[in-house]
Amino acid sequence: IHLGKDFKLKFGENDLTLDQGFMSVGGKLPAAHDLVTPELDVFKLPKGVRKIIYTVPSLDTPVCETQIKQLSESLTHEDVSTTKYYVISIDTPFAQSRFIKENNISPKIQFVSDYANHRFMIETGLRIIELNLFARSVIECDETDTVLNVTIPVDITHIP
């Protein structure tokens, strides 16, 4: 879908709606305040690095698990020294930590949680209103935090 223009998603046969948010392709990535790592540290997305951010509804779903495992496996074979990879969800930091350990996820992926106030989820326009969860997406940003591309599948059960 086109972020900022299309606000309808599907969960199977059910219609869902995205918040509008402030993020747009060509614009700046909204500030990521109050994100928390699995180690319970406050985290801000760093400036000056190329980023690929995966937002997922919940790591405790089969689709999210498959998506992140595939990402982790792909990073074991690539040199990604110039790009940083992030997974953001509203899962608690404890749930993220468990997921990382149980699934042997690559340390090249930084997990962060927006569980506390959902600010990043709302400001990016990726909040599914009916579920109060992130839409599944991939956000690509350059070193200046300019959003280069946002991929959001129409059906949240599909991997972008």
Question: Would you name each region that the model predicts?
Answer:
Residues 1-160:
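Chalcogenol-based redox active-site neighborhoods
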